[in-house]
Amino acid sequence: MKKLAKKLLLLFISIQFVACEGSLEPHLYGVVDTGNAFNTPADLSAATVALYYELRQKGWGPYLFCDGSSFVMDEVSTEEWTTKWSWVAFLNGSWTDADQMVKGFYNWTAPNITRCTYTIAKMEESPVTQSVKDLYIAEVRALRAFFMFDLYRLYGPMPMILEADQAINPDPDYKPYRPTSEEVGTFLTTELRAAADALPVEQAEYGRITKGAALHYLLKYYMHEKQWQNALETANEIIGLNYYELEKDYASIFSAQNEGNKELMFVVRAEPLADYGNHTYANILPGDYASPYGNIVEGWSGHRMPWEFYDTFDENDRRRALAQAEYTSKSGATVDLRASGDVGALPLKYGIDPEATGTWAGNDKVLDRYAEVLLFKAEALNELNGPNQGSVDLINDIRKRAFGFGTSLPAIPVFKESFDGEFVDNVIGIFSMNNYDQAGGSAWKYDVDKNNTLNNGNSLHVEVESSGTEFWTLQMRTEPLVAKGRKYSCLLYTSDAADE
């Protein structure tokens, strides 16, 4: 089962000139045009594969690990990732619209919307059997929705070519309007729902979009929009497919030797070959890093996991071992990155592909996996119901893999207290704090500035003396009586007395 990208057609133009009385007639062989491109199932498959190629683009595409990719765009806004390269404006959030780093994903991906629209229109005109057309059209509709959702979450609603006539016969003077968020949402949910209904749970060729992959993007949209009930129902639909499962070993999820495992829902496939692989480790490794497998690997010493984030991992968390704080150099020396002043650990979640040579690794880039479905469901349940055993059970499914054990929610909380305060302008706010302490011995107190009235001009102070065996849930919310047309915000700060 080789990579989809390898199936791309290479078009060679052979021109034969034949001498005739008074004229020369050119004959073009092997040229794909609108008259012969979508006439067979193989044509439809090739057209679909060409769109999958846009995910990777010779290993430097929008869904891999390169500059401006969705990976970098997502991680730069967190405290989980940094780079040693001179991306000062990008890392500090002070970029402008002239910065290629922040608009690279858009420039790569936005044209794919038009390509998908064109392909769908041509497939609909194809003489191929309807059932065959429906399957390929569903894949392309899903891909178009994938592209559009990721553009939407990174850039907001953007003008897109969704009209077949404009995709087939583009008008240089045509200017598509900027849709509203609601219009984007209607388009995404309609397209993903239709695609999911038409796609199989498992494709004959690994790497193609499945029912579960389409549903997962639908779930991501609902989570992004905080549509908790829709998210819960979609998560349950994915779970109900009875197809996906968690890998027992976290590291094996991303291993090049464990492709196609049942935790993976959608990936960008790769081979350890130039243009067909991923430079997963090349962005990370120092130049003198020695592969534990003896193969020659290159490193550009850029991506890092900041020490502040690395130190949040419990020493018993098995995932911590995938971020290397020290390594063996090609000279055989042990290099301590923290001691040497490096900005962070090596985030080698994807590991080193033992078959890799130079830059290119064969690890598939994981875009969606089943663990996210379980955590999304846990979050949706908590948003709908508050702290509940169902959410804890789902989280424990993940924790047990990392720690070998989970945590529990007592049947009867030993402590429950709430504080109701009247906001100004008839806005009601409710503060509640729940302590689940299985060992006892903890205490807490709170006070509110300005005569104990919680409003938009003061603060709530909570002090907790911890027994070390409990966990807390804190909720801050506004009731339906909030004034319409106004914006509210709540900032929560926590600190440990030992840090003060």
Give, region by region, the residue ranges found by the protein language model.
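Elongated scaffold/linker segments in the mid-to-C-terminal portions of large proteins
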Residues: 42-43, 48, 56-61, 77, ...
